Amino acid sequence: MDKASVFIARVKFARDSNSQVKPRQFIVILKDVNNVFFLETESTLNKRKFNVNNRSKTKRYYHILSQTEINQNGFKIPTAINCKEVFKCDYFPELIKLKNREVTSDLIEKVIAKVNDIRSNGLNEPDVFITYQELLAHNSKLAYG
């Protein structure tokens, strides 16, 4: 696995209001041979927190991709990366089956810097650990060789 990629995975979060597990898009960053971090991406279309009035506040916690970043990284719609909430997972080789595409190192450097800035200022949410079993339960791709 490269340093960072876009992954599509079905994940059930405690904050989810309904029981339906939906596919989510993440930027997955390989920290080392044992750990990966997931940062959730989000469409900015028609969302109140991304409108002109709220954008400056939202930018404190999200990296909102420029049109150039959207094009360079294969996103189809305006997208932001949630840098306030980090999901951690132990690395396992089957994880690569959820990979969708690569992202540029320039984007990853910006995102990591933003995550670190948010954390150093105590503005982050508590980290969430995702287990292999949780991913396996909702992502049948992981079970097949």
Where does each model-flagged region fall?
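Loop/turn positions that initiate beta-strands
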Residues: 4-6
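Compact nucleic-acid interaction/catalytic patches
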Residues: 17-23, 28-68
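C-terminal terminal-subdomain/extension
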Residues: 59-145
